[in-house]
From Swiss-Prot:
It is found in: Nucleus. The lineage of its organism: Eukaryota, Fungi, Dikarya, Ascomycota, Taphrinomycotina. SUPFAM superfamilies: Zn2/Cys6 DNA-binding domain. This is Uncharacterized transcriptional regulatory protein C11D3.11c. It comes from the Eukaryota.
């Protein structure tokens, strides 16, 4: 006796005695056929099911792009379809840790801002362009006063290891030479860094300016730093979040850091920008991709640190990440003044340790 009903009985939805041939087929004069194997016992691995879901999401996103694309672009989009076997069970089982890159839609709002939308977004391209009356990023006119420069040096010498979401080389090159056209140095970020750096000054008059710097940074980011997501706004929010946590305002610090992470996800900073292109031209240069990598992984460490200090769950998940590890940018003349003073940090650490024990 077989373990499965015959195909005819299953189609007619009648009880089969599972003989070969079965009684129902004999009486009806039909050919009795059985499946060779029981597919109910087949269990696909989770990675295989995940690959199917990812493939389906990609196809849905692709056809949405085709739907909203101009007529002259639809054919070009169809030519990009690949019919390779993406769902080999052997490959899926052997690569259980593979990160699946979801298809993205990019809203390029200007040279400094790119918004990311995943496969389930309801905004079909083209999106509404930004209003010209609303600046997508703050005006760039950082101050070169000795006070500002000294506070920045204090920030990088004493606090930088905790603020690795700021790429020192990219920031300083933009601060001094406007090399990146303000992408990595803005007023609100500058004053947020000064608020933290000034507190490390041995001069009580400079240390007392920390709250003033904080208020300036806060006013500026409220004025023009939240309307559109921007890299320096992410960094500023994290600096302000750290500042508040250090002052005991843990709820506000937690909220500001959460805003920063959400803004980063709006920019897709957890994804590998080297895969983004428009008309076969990369959207993000290799140098900018390296900076974005540092910003994301620095934010990732910050998320873990703040969550650990406050005993709360993290926001950024490694499983959602495809951006590669960060790399160091080349030095430039004058960067030594902004290096972390390891000897002084060790000396202070030993002093603190001796006072505690």
């Amino acid at each position: 006796m077989r373990s499965l009903s015959c195909i005819v009985c299953r189609q007619k939805k009648i009880k089969c005695d599972r003989k070969n041939p079965c009684t129902n087929c004999e009486q009806a004069g039909e050919k009795c056929m059985f499946k060779e194997y029981d597919s109910r016992k087949i269990r696909h691995p989770h990675s295989y099911v995940k690959a199917l879901e990812t493939r389906l999401a990609g196809l849905e996103a692709f056809w949405k792009r085709v739907k909203y694309a101009p007529v002259n672009e639809k054919l070009e989009l169809l030519k990009t379809i690949s019919f390779n076997d993406h769902l080999s069970p052997d490959i899926s089982v052997s690569k259980t840790d593979t990160t699946f890159e979801f298809p993205v839609s990019l809203d390029i709002r200007g040279p400094n801002t790119i918004a990311f939308y995943g496969p389930t977004n309801v905004y079909g391209p083209p999106l509404t362009p930004s209003s010209p009356e609303t600046p997508s990023f703050p005006p760039q006119n950082p101050s070169f006063s000795p006070l500002i420069t000294d506070c920045l040096k204090l920030f990088f010498k004493w606090q930088y290891p905790q603020f690795l979401f700021i790429n020192r080389e990219a920031f300083l090159v933009d601060y001094y030479y406007r090399y990146h056209e303000g992408r990595y140095c803005s007023e609100h970020l500058l004053y947020a860094m000064c608020a933290i750096g000034s507190r490390m000054s041995v001069d009580p008059n400079i240390a007392a300016l920390a709250k003033n710097f904080y208020q300036i940074a806060w006013n500026k980011i409220i004025e023009y730093g939240l309307g559109k997501s921007h890299i320096t706004s992410i960094q500023c929010l994290l600096c302000l979040g750290y500042f508040n946590i250090g002052m005991g305002n843990t709820s506000l610090g937690w909220m500001l850091s959460g805003m920063a992470f959400r803004m980063g996800q709006d920019l897709g900073f957890q994804l590998n920008p080297r895969n983004w292109s428009v008309n076969d031209h990369p959207v993000v240069s290799p140098a900018d991709a390296a900076v974005r990598s540092r910003i994301y992984w620095g934010s990732y460490v910050t998320d873990i640190f703040i969550s650990f200090v406050l005993g709360r769950p993290t926001t950024l998940k490694k499983s959602d990440t495809s951006i590669p590890d960060s790399e160091s940018l080349p030095d430039f003349d004058g960067v030594n003044e902004y290096r972390v003073n390891n000897a002084l940090l060790l000396k202070e650490y030993l002093c603190i340790q001796s006072s505690v024990y």
